[in-house]
Amino acid sequence: MDSAPQQQPPVEFETDPSRYRHWQVSFDGPIARLKMAVDPAGGLRPGYELKLNSYDLGVDIELADVVRRLRFEHPEVRVVVLSSGTDNVFCAGANIHMLGMSTHAWKVNFCKFTNETRCEMEDATAFSDQIYIAAANGTCAGGGYELALACKEIYLQDDGNSAVSLPEVPLLGVLPGTGGLTRLVDKRKVRRDRADVFSTTAEGMRGKRAKDWNLVDGVFARSKFEQEVMKRAQAIAAAPIKLLPGERRGVTLGPITPELAAHARLYRHVELSWDREARTAQILVRGPSAADVAVVTAGDEAIHAAGDQLWALRAFRELDDALLQLRTNHLDIGLVLLRTEGDPAQVLAHDAALAASREHWFVNEVLRHMARVLRRLDLTSRSFFALGDVVGNGMPAFAGCLLELALAADRFYLLDEPAVQVGLSALNEGALPMSHGLSRLAARLYGEPDKFEALVGQRGLMDAEAADDAGLVTVRLDGIDWADDTRMAIEERSSLSPDALTGMEANLRFVGHENETSKIFARLTAWQNWIFIRPNATGPEGALSLYGKPQRPHFDWNRV
């Protein structure tokens, strides 16, 4: 079992600006300056230095926090200028020595998290009117160029030395792991033959050629670089756009600070617990209370005043942290049981009020955040079974936004009792899309369009039989069969190969068309993960293993 990261102190994903070691953020009206100034001694794990603005998971945890806080705490920002605080280098990408000494699981989780952060930058540009500009004031290599590719525009310093490059294939025997190849051809629309040349040219490309090949949007001489980049940023910030309504007063994201128990993390609205012997975990999400519903039904100003304590924001921040904990600190957990608790009617009332206010900038950010957390669940390599049964005195609350958990799960078991109900809201109809753009309801009923059309616009609660007939339930069980049938399903799932299940689930969850984002996770990431375990990369004589050493790699020349 690949469990080395668990022998280290557990990774915590919560941070705040007072704890940043690697990023500097400043503000000038609608323009934010985000400088990457990585502390070489600030690695998350011992054994490597973060030289040349290279990054590890700790650097990216801070970046993810910056991106999210810009959206919630600084809605006045229209442009984010991303540059380097280190002379002559923008970013050297992921730290190669960190990758070389890491387990396969650590590399995979690291790349997945960095991919999600880059996607969140693009999401901010698309839906929060925060345009990211990369000001590559130095060498921009590998993951550094991939970071720039996540920005809407890229500007390169023309000084005879600064270049953009993706040297992973020629130097390391791996792929650019953070979306580079996909964004090169799908986003920047670089011709694929030119992309082939670029991706096998270790030194990359500079100046006019980089601009001619559309690898960057412009090149400026060193003497004018800062001036020209800021001129462009000011032009974007001044461009007239139709902003969402609502006074642009930021909402501070305070800590969520779970209570830690021996086998659990207890949040206000979420509980994560685990059983290592059974290799299972449970995530319980409690629905909104009557008081929570009263807040959202009071309108835009009341929702904004609730700030980070708004149920929809707080609960999904807690769920996000729980998912990241499972991914990184609990590698031996293979099956996650998703449960909800509360009043499904209150969830529907909550969703209706939130949907009615969705044109307010803060509500838009809350909904976008909910969507990103649910996509994190979709992309998590664990089996998920949603269990809609009565636990203690609590009723299941799989309705509206919490029904998304059941629709995201690989299976949904529902207890057939009169008091158990599920329901749909406007949020199930595209407000919380998957990474490839479909709603989970549309993905669930992709092969049954008549059932899908019948559910569109349907509101209110339905009993277990009606939900089953509508195609929302995998298995409907009565009280007599529930305990035995779910126990056997859980035991069977836990006995199967985790590798095979990861591949199977990734193929079955994302029906329908692909887009740039889904290609990054389904194609680029899958190939990268395979290459990571091949001897040509990570064997004793592989290119990644020997990077920085005097020996040359020895390849197995057989194509697979």
Where do the PLM segments sit?
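Proline/glycine-anchored alpha-helix kink/cap motifs
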Residues: 125, 372-375, 442
